[in-house]
């Protein structure tokens, strides 16, 4: 099977990823080898695998503290597996409804020797009541007004949403104004990161879930 060309590792990867770079190289090689065949990534995504996917996910790992994180719709492992590689002090639960992708996440976490990964082959809404997390993230899942009611039940009181968004995030926040209030979200804001590490800009929507009275 012919594989698409893979983006060379950018110089900024060393600065951003530090000691995790070796494991991320192994992960990138596996995505390049199996990604198209398993339907994890499209052929046009491999020529920006590092910049758009791996480094983009690595930026999130720099924004959170130790604790627990759930990645909703983890897919090929962006950002969940990348966070797990970079942050052994974060216990990562990868929630993925598609069986072949969940199997990939299980197999890849074992190949990489990650002891801080749990994979749930379920829809996010079906996991409600099983656990709550310090952080919940999602990437390229849906607009905030749809996504927030889905993921807030997974966040512990006082925990935080850290949702990876695109350039339309400000409009999404305006569209979701009533949803933010209804779901008890505090201090909603957009954090822009990336240029300080010499890589592309990434926008992260952050909001804290209110403590119970």
What are the functions of these language-model segments?
Residues 89, 93, 168-213:
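Active-site capping/gating segments
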Residues 125-135:
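A short acidic, Gly/Pro-enriched loop at the edge of an enzyme's catalytic core
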């Amino acid at each position: 099977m012919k594989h698409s060309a893979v983006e060379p590792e950018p110089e900024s990867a060393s600065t951003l990823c530090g000691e995790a770079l070796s494991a991320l190289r192994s992960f990138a090689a596996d995505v390049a080898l199996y990604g198209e065949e398993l339907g994890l990534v499209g052929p046009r995504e491999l020529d920006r695998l590092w910049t758009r996917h791996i480094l983009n996910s690595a930026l999130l790992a720099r924004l959170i503290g130790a604790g627990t994180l759930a990645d909703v719709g983890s897919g090929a492992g962006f950002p969940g597996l990348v966070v797990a590689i970079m942050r052994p002090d974060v216990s990562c639960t990868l929630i993925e409804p598609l069986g072949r992708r969940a199997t990939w996440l299980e197999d890849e976490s074992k190949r990489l020797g990650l002891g801080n990964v749990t994979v749930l082959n379920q829809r996010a809404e079906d996991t409600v009541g099983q656990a709550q997390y310090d952080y919940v993230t999602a990437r390229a899942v849906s607009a905030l007004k749809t996504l927030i009611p889905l993921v807030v039940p997974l966040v512990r009181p006082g925990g935080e949403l850290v949702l990876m968004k695109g350039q339309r995030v400000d409009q999404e926040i305006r569209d979701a104004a009533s949803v933010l209030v209804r779901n008890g979200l505090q201090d909603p804001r957009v954090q822009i990161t990336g240029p300080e590490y010499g890589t592309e800009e990434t926008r992260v929507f952050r909001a804290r879930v209110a403590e119970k009275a």
